[in-house]
Amino acid sequence: MSNIKLGVEVISAQGLLQRDKHNSCSPFVELKFDNQIFRATTKHNDPNPVWHECFYFVVSDPSVLSTRTLEAHVYSYQNEFDAKPFLGKVRVNGTSFVPRSEAAPFNYPLEKRSVFSRARGELCLRVFITDDPSVTPSVPTPVPESPQAYSPSPRKEHVKSLITADASMATDERRELKPKTRTFHNSAPLVKQQPMMNYGIHEMRAAPMPPRVVQVNGPGPSLHQLPPDFSVKETSPLLGGGRIVGGRVVRGTERPTSGTYDLVEEMKFLYVRVVKARDLPNKDLTGSLDPYVVVKIGNFKGVTTHFNKNTDPEWNQVFAFAKDNLQSNFLEVMVKDKDILLDDFVGIVKFDLREVQSRVPPDSPLAPQWYRLENKRGEKKNYEIMLAVWSGTQADEAFGDATFSDSLVDSDSSNIISANLRSKVYHSPRLWYLRVQILEAQDVIIVSDKSRVPEVFVRVKVGNQMLRTKFPQRSNNPKWGDEFTFVVAEPFEDNLVLSVEDHTAPNRDEPVGKAVILMNDIEKRIDDKPFHDRWVHLEDSISDAMDVDKAKKVKFATRLRYKAVLDGGYHVFDESMYNSSDLRPSSRKLWKPAIGVLELGILNANVFHSMKTREGKGTSDTYVVAKYGHKWVRSRTVINSMNPKYNEQYTWEVFDPATVLTICVFDNAHFAAGDGGNKRDQPIGKVRIRLSTLQTGRVYTHAYPLLVLQPTGLKKRGELHLAVRFTCTSVSSMLMKYTKPLLPKMHYILPLSTNQQEALKMQAINIIIVRLGRSEPPLRREVVDYLTDWKSQLFSMRRSKANFNRFTTVFSGALSVWKWMEQVCTWKTPVTTALVHVLYTMLVTFPEMILPTVFLYMAVIGMWNYRFKPRFPPHMDAKLSYADNVNSDELDEEFDTFPTVRAPDIVKMRYDRLRSVAGKVQSVAGDIAAQGERVQALLSWRDPRATAIFVTFCFIIAMALYITPFKLVALLSGYYFMRHPKLRHRIPSAPVNFFRRLPAMTDSML
């Protein structure tokens, strides 16, 4: 049997409904889990009872523990003959079960049993999992027959716990009850004793069904031997707006924080802004001063940059110290002189933290003040420093520019590039499609050889993108008509360069002339109206081509005719269409008003595997990046923490619900001054949330698994705790979005080919990488690549299997209907077959009822499935992706580069495997084509006898159907199709035999 048990401690209840004639109630609690029912004692005439009773349920199958549900029903006892008035219930999902070391009492609001029932109040429970073999499951006691059995009596229970460093905790409980009561004893070695607590007797009523017994050979798995959990877990954190329970915000007694930060936990910081100093003394022998400031609280120390030979420096740097980690009651701000061997002391200012004032936005920023520095003897000097010290939260304006105490590797932060640690917001550039059409050229003359007719082509270049036309017929006035599409970013930095070149040899091209068109001079359009052509003179170099005055003086030169336009009616894809976060066109004129607001609270993360080693210990330096639309956000980097806390909140405007929010976690490899530029930030995991799967107004608080697929297999590197809320500002506009096209209309009027879209998407990603790489701190290439996920289009045997499984799953419903119809036709269930006959007769007799019946049936199914609607947003499914049990060679092939770098024998093996799979696909495609060719052969006279038979049959059937009512024909056909097995033959029917004998084009295949 499994050693895992579910422990439930019933602590108390408050605010219960008063259901008896004395305006009170006598509550008791029934706990139900896995066909096991336990009952707490009855508290007579107490609407705010206190129990402190603990029960242990047997977990029969730990592998499905996350799918189980614990139910706690609260009733009021009246007498043994009356019904129990219902006071409320609580449902706790299995995904919320945690080890005992992490469990804490929680007040669950009581829910109604049905629409017409009433419920009020809260029930305080403590739910946990334990695998301690010394803890025995609760044993049922007989339910007394008399009302006196429910009277309360004083009982005591001593609980002693064994706490280990991991998540599981071994418990030893000894219950001492009065005589005439049943006592349970559990013995185990004691390490740490908890305070004495009073518990009540464990009562249990008989369940309506016998408990399920599962026999397991061998010992059961421990809590840490369970398979890895790749599912999403619902959490109930205490955020700024209150406790989140089931998507609802339960307000507490404390004053809520500002609504701007109601999706994150409030974090308090001590902010120190070092502005500047003046009239500092000279310390060096040369009569100069290289000042810098040290801000110190306990063991935390922040250091500003130093200035060379400056007695009036200006720093304007902010330091933030987490108030829950402060190790001293005093703040020291020291000014020092940078020296080669030992830095000299200049002066110091001390602050008592108890005197520091608090500031909460929307209060104005705190004005800095001048403070006179003291020497080591405490004497005031004439040189001063300007400081501002205040207590605030992450809602403060200085939060984004501050250097945090958890971002310091050691006591000296001078080797830290603080810019790479701060939270920032990025905006990707607005992308346009540039459509260029090369028409013709005139007077193309080769100066070196005027007698030779040139073979010219045009090279079109925009930034790093370059395409070329085909070779026309040799002529001095060539014509092309080729059209090209590029991606450009606004604000426009690159120009359109047209270069005419002469192909003189197989590997030799000589320039004829160049023309430069400024991007701002190109017209823009938002529809499919024709755009105008232009003539341009060719110059010898780009500098001459950009000289406007010289172009006006040219009397004779080679001319090029072209068309160019910026298409603003398209949406430029920079990510996969199915995972797009924005579908708006490039032109702002076509943008519609926003339909809602998306709010994201990045709470914290749990990193299971260290990403690097520092000072002989494994650690991680993590940050979070989220993308939606044109807005990218990056959280601050938390140094040396496997459980970082961010508590940062961001908002986006939503223009379409059929979009996806992408969040990724990375390990920072570029924060130290000694880090080289060749290092890459390693991804820890990714989360995608589709907005259309979210209920408006609900707060989704979940722990998402961070999964990364590597050549060694699927790894769960941690969990990311998020709070997401989608608020709709216009319900009618959002509902109308479901009737609108997904993409702008230009994608349907002048569609781009699939290959063209993929090429343009890669150009767009490269442009975004370049633009975001210029920011400070830069958003690096590996981050953009991982968020856009452009590698998903590459071949993968794993994805091929997963997509084929999805294909079969989609049609599994139709296959089930076909199997059910076979059972109807074979009369396996005569009652069902008879009912189908009756229904079929009604539909044929009244055909106008067919469509209403079908749509009514679908409506009823939809309403029935509302009870089972998904409660969690969808997440990356390891089983659906075939990532949990994939072949190592297939993974190695998936991570191979282009071109391959594997050994020839491995490539040969993979090629042969691909050939075998392709051969099966080829055979299936040929069989499908053969069936269609047989249909065509019915009237093609390829088989004259078969066609003659079919034509004669059609003529006879036409005459018969003309004189026979259609309803009669339909009834007879249906009855014949569902005829009894005694009227059937095992051999194929005549129509099937006739169809299989028809010829196909397979005979003509080589």
From Swiss-Prot:
Cross-referenced Pfam families: C2 (PF00168), PRT_C (PF08372)
Tissue localization of expression: Expressed in incipient leaf primordia and roots meristems. Observed in flowers.
Xref: CDD domains: C2A_MCTP_PRT_plant (cd04022), C2B_MCTP_PRT_plant (cd08378), C2C_MCTP_PRT_plant (cd04019), C2D_MCTP_PRT_plant (cd08379)
Binding site for Ca(2+) 2: D284, D337, D339, D344
Species the sequence originates in: Arabidopsis thaliana
Transmembrane segments: 842-862, 946-966
SMART domains, A to Z: C2 (SM00239)
Protein name (Swiss-Prot/TrEMBL): Multiple C2 domain and transmembrane region protein 9
Listed Gene3D superfamilies: C2 domain (2.60.40.150)
